From Swiss-Prot:
Residues 374-396 have a biased composition (Acidic residues). This is Interleukin enhancer-binding factor 2 homolog. Its main location: nucleus. The keyword Repressor does not apply. It comes from Drosophila melanogaster (Fruit fly). Keywords: Activator, DNA-binding, Nucleus, Transcription, Transcription regulation. GO terms for biological process: mRNA splicing, via spliceosome; positive regulation of DNA-templated transcription. Pfam families: DZF_C, DZF_N. Residues 22-379 form the DZF domain. One of its GO terms (cellular component) is catalytic step 2 spliceosome.
Length: 396
């Protein structure tokens, strides 16, 4: 008989028990917009004049929006490709290597948040059959042939000639002016049947199906014009500030929707207030370990979107937002928007209206003796420590 146990294998009272792991309860960071009733403004201070900031935001949005010629070029190409794919769903003809179930536009072009100079539209093609590499090749050739046949009566310039390029996600159809990315997916019940040597990558298939859910949610919940303006400005920030580059397009969609629509009045906030609120939330630790963050509304299981970032990336995003929030508070919005100067304000000391602002530095340091596989343990440890200490999760 095993020591410490009764006959029959039942453990004795007081025997060795597994260590108790406290349940992680995420907390919401401080949000001045939601807590404004508890922090009334000083009457003598008066309202802040943000007219200059509002005008700068609208001007920057106009600069970042695609020109009418760009919109026309990408719109025409998308219409032609969509017509060919829709026809293959109904009448596949001699295409026998795969069967199409559905064709859906996704991404920035469909949402109306595309940036100028990035004339790329995304279309997800869901296959009834398994997505083999041979099937993708055959589909690309069929689409190219049908596209040429549909345009045989048109007079095409050299720049209007289409090229097809196959890649790991599907294939691209492009001309000099625009490009349409065909992203291949399959029915959810087929995902478990995929084999790495034969079919396209399982994770890529999941991401393409997720893109459909993201676009559907956006059309239903984030169609307000102010949200699209803010998303376009945030996308530009991710291009110019390295600290924000880990933020995915889906994260930007969600934080823009949160900043504008999640308030006591349930009415869209003005663009200037929403722009400030984004930096306030990130500075307060919205995307730090221990924070409730933003739950992905399209996924089961209460997944916080910022957990896709590493701990270093979460820290850099937070302290960079804190620096930029201080710059914004003292009138440095033109440097943040890229209308003047450069991005050195997050790396070098700067002076704004007599106020000296020094950039903040990293708080989190990754242990050098741990492997990449220990990252989840680090996150759990930090979140549990924060829970016990009752900190505000702000990387000051």
């Amino acid at each position: 008989m095993v020591r410490g146990a009764l006959r029959g294998g039942r453990p004795m009272r007081g025997g060795i028990r597994p260590p108790f792991k406290k349940t992680f309860v995420p907390r919401h960071p401080f949000d001045l917009t939601l807590a404004e009733v508890f922090f009334p403004k000083v009457p003598s201070a008066g309202a802040v004049d943000d007219s200059a900031l509002t005008a700068a935001l609208l001007k920057r949005n106009q600069d970042l929006s695609p020109t009418p010629s760009e919109q026309t070029a990408i719109g025409n190409l998308v219409t032609k490709v969509q017509a060919v794919l829709d026809n293959l769903v109904v009448a596949p003809g001699d295409l026998t290597t795969c069967q199409l179930e559905e064709v859906r536009q996704v991404g920035s072009f469909k949402k109306g948040t595309i940036l100028t100079g990035n004339n790329v539209a995304d279309v997800v093609v869901i296959l009834k059959t398994l997505p083999t590499k041979e099937a993708v090749d055959a589909l690309a050739k069929k689409v190219e042939a049908d596209l040429k046949a549909s345009m045989k009566t048109e007079v095409l310039t050299k720049g209007d000639q289409h090229t097809v390029q196959i890649h790991e996600r599907g294939f691209d159809i492009a001309n000099v002016h625009a490009k349409v990315r065909i992203l291949i997916a399959t029915l959810p019940q087929n995902l478990r049947k995929l084999e790495p040597e034969i079919h396209l990558d399982h994770k890529l298939m999941q991401s393409h199906l997720a893109a459909i859910r993201h676009t559907r949610w956006f059309e239903e919940n984030a169609h307000h014009s102010s949200i699209k303006v803010l998303i376009r400005i945030l996308k530009d920030l991710t291009r110019r500030f390295d600290a924000f580059s880990p933020l995915s397009a889906w994260m930007l969609d969600l934080i823009a929707h949160l900043a504008i629509m999640n308030n006591p009045s349930r009415q869209a906030l003005p663009i200037n207030l929403a722009f400030r609120r984004v930096f306030q939330l990130l500075s307060a630790g919205l995307f730090l370990p221990g924070s409730a963050g933003i739950t992905d509304p399209t996924e089961p299981g209460h997944i916080r979107v910022h957990t896709a970032m590493t701990l270093e990336q979460q820290d850099v995003c937070c302290y960079t937002s804190q620096t930029l929030l201080r710059v914004l508070a003292h009138g440095g919005y033109k440097h943040i928007l890229g209308l003047e100067g450069n991005t050195s304000v997050v790396r070098e000391m700067s002076v704004w209206n007599g106020v000296c602002i020094s950039p903040l530095t990293a708080v989190y340091e990754k242990p050098t003796d741990k492997k990449e596989g220990d990252l989840e343990e680090d996150i759990d440890m930090i979140e549990n420590e924060n829970e016990e200490e009752g900190s505000d999760d702000g990387a000051e």
